[in-house]
Design a protein with these regions (language model features):
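Metal-ion/cofactor- or nucleotide/acyl-coenzyme-handling active-site neighborhoods
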Residues: 1-219
Length: 219
């Protein structure tokens, strides 16, 4: 059964489809591992791996960074444009020819954008992956909380688990530390690079959830 959320007296499903491999009912502890370079400041890997559920986002790497970010990924939340056309050009995400093949044991949870390209890439490289899609109405709910065009995958992950009644531990959400200015812990990103997300607004949303004891922020 696909879980629903009720907001302003309206109910709608969280997922467009839900494969049987996604069983949130049994989850007691969950780690949302974001992509900030602040993750390199601490060896949280073993702590992260102890969670029942570990969620990562987009192109976040694990291999070579296990002591910082853990070694397991249960769900990877992906923007529909996360592959940036690479799945059609035989060039894998992040210019790493082996990256897609390292994801073969992960479950994908996808925002409903550029879906055809995404599925073509998955079927070509790693067709064992279960693919699930967030419902457009749930995405609209998330996007309406910010003034930018769309909420980040990191915020969507937070709202997803909180909506499901799961209190997550947040790792690597960069706006909680200034000790490392790398946007992504595994790569150098141009200082002029813009995500198009409103992280100040997103921080305020997450702060409010923290104040209401709905999540933990691990620094």
């Amino acid at each position: 059964m696909i879980p629903e959320v009720s907001i302003n007296n309206q109910s709608f499903p969280i997922f467009s489809n839900l494969n049987s491999n996604l069983d949130f009912i049994k989850v007691k502890t969950a780690a949302l591992v974001a992509s900030s370079g602040t993750l390199l400041d601490n060896n949280f890997g073993d702590e992260i791996d102890k969670h029942d559920l570990i969620i990562r986002f987009n192109a976040a790497r694990v291999k070579g960074y296990e002591k910082y970010v853990g070694s397991r990924t249960d769900i990877r939340i992906l923007n529909g444009h996360a592959f940036n056309g690479s799945t059609k050009k035989d060039i894998c995400l992040g210019h790493d020819p082996n990256f897609l093949t390292t994801l073969e044991n992960e479950t994908f949870l996808v925002k409903s954008y550029n879906v055809q390209e995404f599925i073509e890439g998955v079927m070509k490289y790693i067709n064992k992956n279960p693919i699930n899609f967030l419902h457009p109405n749930f995405l609209i709910y998330c996007n309406n909380l910010v003034s930018k065009p769309e909420a980040s995958a990191g915020l969507i992950g937070v709202l997803l688990l909180v909506t499901l009644g799961i209190k997550p531990d947040l790792y690597g959400y960069g706006f909680y530390s200034e000790s490392n200015d790398k946007v992504h812990y595994w790569e150098e990103v141009n200082s002029n690079w813009s995500t198009g997300h409103g992280f100040d607004e997103e921080k305020n949303i997450i702060d409010d959830l923290y104040k209401n004891n709905l999540l933990n922020i691990i620094k």
